[in-house]
Amino acid sequence: PTLSLTQDSALPYNFQFNAANNVEVRRAEVNAYIQANVVRDMIMQYAPTHPVIPGQTEFRVNVAVSGTCNAFYDGSSINFYNSGGGCANTAFYDVVHHEYGHHVVATGGSGQGQYGEGMSDCMGVLLSDQPILGFGFQNNCNAGIRSANNTLQYPCSQAIHTCGQLISGCLWDTRNELVNAGVSNYRDLLKLWCLNSVRLHRGDLIAPNITIDWLVLDDNDANLNNGTPHYQYINAGFSRHNMPGPAIVGLDFSFPDGLPTNLAPDRTNTIRFDVLPLAAQPEPNSGRIGYRVNGGAVSYVTATQIAPNQYTVDLPPIACNQRVDYFFTARAQDNSNWSSPAGAPTAAYAAVTNYEPTPVRLADNFQTNLGWAVTNGTGLTAGSWQRAI
């Protein structure tokens, strides 16, 4: 069929497709055409650098394909079945979104499998802002065929359509975290993260590296250690499916003079360290050093703040030939505690108390003339130095 309209070029006009709306195949054609373009338009708006799709001017959308109760993507077209076998005509909203989603995944560089099924389900979730895929697919408008509102856990080894719900579940739970926090532009954020993450993914599995991809897309300072603007919501949503993001670091420690591995015995040893803000702000005057000798009990010494976030600390005298494990702590203004190394006091830096060897000022094996001259003192009668080879 064709559709034509005569118009004044200066005025906007709208084409009306399928005005009668009384023929299943015509309705399927219109639905499939419009809904495929809805997904494409979403890609164009939120992921304009996605490969292929922005410049693709022709893509086959086939309806009335022989069969019932299914639809498919074959790499160059999306295809939909007529009604029958207890199912509706499959060319309708989120089923079309799903099949075009396979095209998004393929052009983005990933395999299909569980990832392709799940990410394709996400297209419908992003557009409808509800978790059920395929309301009415089986002629029941109160039920669908899959749901993003699920408790599926990573790793998943079930059928690919089942495991695909792992990523749609992460999307839906992240959505709920944003909504509950009152983030008004949550739909825009979800589309940005989800659609652009496709280009970062490879393979056909759903794994926690996807969480990192979302965080990278949300990040604003090229440092995931201090979190991202929406870290708490993304991490919470993905954690519900056993795909947490990397732990953020509140405070960072640096050591202007380095970390000693040799401490002078029987006297005070002074160490400098700085406490730097990452995801949190340092609490002034909260720096300390903890240490233990030969695996004994941990003792603490409060450091002296010599400038904002800069400290010196004096380790008390320790006898010679002792192993000293030590670490640094500080408190953030949100009352969280941080240490260097992470995991202290179990993890610690190590040093020994020992006298440093006397530095060598000159080495001469007397086999080569290094240009020294020997002058014997007045009255010397024997034992003068001579270089001999």
Regions found by a protein language model. Give the residues of each.
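Glycan-association/targeting regions that enable binding to alpha-glucans and other polysaccharides
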Residues: 234-389
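Glycine-centered loop-to-beta-strand initiation motif
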Residues: 1-3, 13-15, 307-311
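Extracellular protease catalytic domains of secreted zymogens
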Residues: 4-252
